[in-house]
């Protein structure tokens, strides 16, 4: 008796302990569960009413969600058996496949990826970023490829590309920052700026100017008509004028003439112009021709290198001495 009473007492104590271990929901939690269930049933009743009225579904009065799912599958062309086995019409699975778990993938299951799915890998993935970071190797130049249709340019297959060139990797991604292992990341090529470009252009211009054997002088007076066959006058450019008037209206033009290189420079070859004062004067020496030219008196013709030189229209060849000039203040009379 004692043993039986002890056993019953211990069983009652264990049941009481198990009941005490389970947490009893509060009144508020029970009320929330009831309200949630009522809302779910009200929504389901409205769905069933709409399907019966407008969808011609044969649903019982008190049905659950399984009945609705079965009716939808039948409308879509699927077969739903009493045990829940679902399949397309004419494609009943084998008994071995039906005996599997519910998560078993069947040939006609909705979990099977279709060939047109976006998750299906394409031959050339568009999401690869670079050969080093991509798990799919890009086509290279050195890899053999026997499929002519997969080559974009079939004429480059045999002998079109020399084998001495390094392997070319093709990437369909946007330009990205090179990895640390890339040689371009350690020694990046400096970007050119305007200052370096200007210095390089000036150096090239100086080298090209130094290659000429003839110096350039700036003259503001046009060349003589008799000397046009000796010196070529290039196209003129406007002279720099700091006045308010326009250079086009002022008519001031500057031209560059090329004079023959002579050692030493003669005074007759250097143009007598105010603009020439801006150029560093060359060492001048008197030549026999210059001395003979200064000794010639006033005449309409003179000899130059044993030949008669005639003036052009409107020109008078004469020498004016400094002692023959006098500054007059409006009286117009020269010294007697």
Curated annotation (Swiss-Prot):
Entry's localization field: Nucleus
Processing and modification events after translation: Phosphorylated by BIN2 and MKK5 in response to brassinosteroid (BR). Dephosphorylation level is consistent with ovule and seed number.
Pfam family, one: BES1_N
Region (Required for DNA-binding): 21-104
Induction per the UniProt record: By brassinosteroid (BR). Up-regulated in response to abscisic acid (ABA) via epigenetic regulation on repressive histone marks (H3K27me3) mediated by JMJ30 and JMJ32.
Gene null: resulting phenotype: In bzr1-1D, weak dwarf phenotype with reduced hypocotyl and petiole lengths and dark green curled leaves when light-grown. Increased cell elongation in the dark. Hypersensitive to brassinosteroid (BR).
Protein name (Swiss-Prot/TrEMBL): Protein BRASSINAZOLE-RESISTANT 1
Organism this protein belongs to: Arabidopsis thaliana
């Amino acid at each position: 008796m004692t043993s039986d009473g002890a056993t019953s007492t211990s069983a009652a104590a264990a049941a009481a302990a198990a009941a005490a271990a389970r947490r009893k929901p509060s009144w508020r939690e029970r009320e929330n569960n009831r309200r949630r269930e009522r809302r779910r049933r009200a929504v389901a009743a409205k769905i069933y009413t709409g399907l019966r009225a407008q969808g011609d579904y044969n649903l019982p009065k008190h049905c659950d969600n399984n009945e609705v799912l079965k009716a939808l599958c039948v409308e879509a062309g699927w077969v739903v058996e009493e045990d829940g086995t679902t399949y397309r019409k004419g494609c009943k699975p084998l008994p071995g496949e039906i005996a599997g778990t519910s998560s078993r993938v069947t040939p006609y299951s909705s979990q099977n990826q279709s060939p047109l799915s976006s998750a299906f890998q394409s031959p050339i993935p568009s999401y690869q970023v670079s050969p080093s970071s991509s798990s799919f190797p890009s086509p290279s130049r050195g890899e053999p490829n026997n499929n002519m249709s997969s080559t974009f340019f079939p004429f480059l297959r045999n002998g079109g590309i020399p084998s001495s060139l390094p392997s070319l990797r093709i990437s369909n991604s946007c330009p990205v920052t090179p990895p640390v292992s890339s040689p371009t990341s350690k020694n990046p090529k400096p970007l050119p700026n305007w200052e370096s470009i200007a210095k390089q252009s000036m150096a090239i211009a100086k080298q090209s100017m130094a290659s000429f054997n003839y110096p350039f002088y700036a003259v503001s007076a046009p060349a003589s008509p008799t000397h046009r066959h000796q010196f070529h006058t290039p196209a003129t450019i406007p002279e720099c004028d700091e006045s308010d008037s326009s250079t086009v209206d002022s008519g001031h033009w500057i031209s560059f003439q090329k004079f023959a290189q002579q050692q030493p420079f003669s005074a007759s070859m250097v143009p007598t112009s105010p603009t020439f004062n801006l150029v560093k004067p060359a060492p001048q020496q008197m030549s026999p021709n210059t001395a003979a030219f200064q000794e010639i008196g006033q005449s309409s013709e003179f000899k130059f290198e044993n030949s008669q030189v005639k003036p052009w229209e409107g020109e008078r060849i004469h020498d004016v001495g400094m002692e023959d000039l006098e500054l007059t203040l409006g009286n117009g009379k020269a010294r007697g």
